[in-house]
């Protein structure tokens, strides 16, 4: 059994990318477990019991200055920077991790946990699912694909630093993370909530944007809270380190089952796959003024549609023409028993988005009777 619920004793966590979809969940979990938490972002984090550090991961000088007096024992790296090509992704994202670990050469680091994803098995965006793919569900021991991939470059940086600096490591391969974050580059949960809210506002159907394969195939996802638990487990459980692990919720579903249930939550007419994909980048084109008007009338916290939607990412995810799901046996056999029901991950996120005024609340909640 995993024991990451045990209180921290003199442990200090450095969460890199602390305002993102995975990092924010880690910050919350670690603070709840009694860790001293250092949250490293460019914008800062305001949370009780958490000390924010502002630094630029692209600048060794900025990192050296920001971390000069810090002594983290555990590092959780969840940051990445999207570039135009995979060559640039490799150059930039490998450097982000390398710069951070170099800046910690003086620190008593015991473990570094790195978040990546299932593009480890699928390939990067520009060569996505090209060539022969491993069979599903994906297993951690699959060999690397013969293509350039910034996940591979980050692993190589991690392993070299572990050998040089003497810490243990873990890699966490997540699939489509569901969680709370604003301005995140890959945020399907918030994106679908915004799509459904706009459809509700305009009395339009809630149209599935993806492929026939995704509509009918089995798939899975990763709750950000579960990802945080998994990274903490691997960082602290005896004999769990120095391994790469898949991390998904533990259930599987088909979008043809899930989509009507998401539509029912928002009270919109859910429409499934019909003939061809209908991408969100097309469906939601020109909706910036609609969203700004909704934000003004409903008192929403973010009027900028680009800050609460990532149409391109959701289109790419739901437009895949292959089945995508991951095996969790390795984590289970090592002692991690965490689980989430994906429908609950969605609805709990939607509840929080409403409470935080990121999407409109139902009229009844606002004190206005619903029309009959």
What are these regions (language model features)?
Residues 45-49, 53-102:
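NAD(P)H-binding glycine-rich loop region in Rossmannoid oxidoreductase-like domains
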Residues 142-175, 180:
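Active-site Tyr-X1-5-Lys
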Residues 35-46:
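Conserved glycine-rich Rossmann-like NAD(P)H-binding loop of the short-chain dehydrogenase/reductase
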Residues 194-225:
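A conserved pocket-lining segment of Rossmann-fold NAD(P)-dependent short-chain dehydrogenase/reductase
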Residues 6-33:
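N-terminal Rossmann NAD(P)H-binding glycine-rich loop of SDR-like oxidoreductase domains
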Residues 165, 179-195, 225, 234-245:
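Glycine/proline-rich active-site loop of Rossmann-fold NAD(P)-dependent oxidoreductases
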Residues 75-77, 88, 95-150:
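Conserved Rossmann-fold NAD(P)-dependent oxidoreductase catalytic core, especially the SDR/UDP-sugar
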Residues 228-315, 319, 327-329, 333, ...:
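Mid/C-terminal beta-alpha module of Rossmann-like enzyme folds, strongest
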């Amino acid at each position: 059994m995993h024991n990451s619920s045990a209180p921290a004793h003199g442990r200090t966590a450095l969460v890199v990318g602390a305002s993102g979809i995975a990092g924010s969940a880690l910050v919350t979990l670690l603070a709840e477990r009694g860790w001293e938490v250092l949250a490293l972002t460019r914008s800062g984090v305001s949370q009780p019991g958490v000390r924010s550090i502002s630094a630029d991961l692209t600048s060794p000088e900025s990192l050296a200055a920001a971390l000069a007096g810090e002594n983290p024992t555990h590092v959780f790296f969840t940051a990445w920077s999207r570039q135009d090509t995979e060559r640039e992704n490799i150059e930039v994202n490998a450097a982000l991790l390398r710069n951070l670990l170099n800046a910690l050469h003086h620190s008593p680091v015991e473990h570094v946990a790195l978040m990546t994803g299932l593009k480890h098995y699928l390939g990067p965006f520009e060569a996505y699912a090209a060539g022969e793919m491993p069979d599903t569900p994906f297993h951690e021991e699959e060999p690397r694909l013969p293509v350039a991939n910034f996940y591979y470059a980050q692993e190589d940086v991690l392993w070299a630093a572990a050998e040089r600096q003497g810490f243990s490591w873990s890699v966490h391969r997540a699939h489509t993370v569901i969680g709370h974050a604003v301005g995140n580059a890959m945020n399907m949960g918030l994106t679908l909530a915004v799509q459904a809210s706009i459809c509700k506002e305009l009395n339009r159907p809630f149209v599935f944007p993806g492929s026939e394969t995704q509509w009918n195939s089995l798939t899975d996802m990763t709750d950000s809270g579960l990802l945080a638990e998994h990274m903490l487990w691997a960082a602290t459980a005896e004999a769990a380190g120095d391994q790469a692990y898949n991390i998904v919720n533990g259930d599987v579903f088909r979008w043809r089952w899930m989509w009507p249930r998401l539509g029912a939550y928002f009270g919109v007419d859910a429409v499934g796959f019909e003939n061809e994909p209908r991408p969100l980048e097309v469906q939601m084109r020109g909706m910036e003024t609609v969203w700004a008007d909704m934000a003004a009338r409903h008192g929403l916290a973010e009027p900028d549609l680009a800050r609460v939607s990532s149409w391109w990412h959701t289109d790419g995810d739901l437009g895949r023409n292959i089945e995508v799901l991951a095996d969790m046996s390795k984590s289970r056999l090592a002692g991690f028993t965490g689980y989430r029901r994906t429908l609950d991950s969605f609805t709990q996120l939607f509840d929080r988005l409403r409470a935080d005024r990121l999407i409109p609340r139902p009229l009844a909640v606002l004190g206005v009777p619903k029309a009959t």
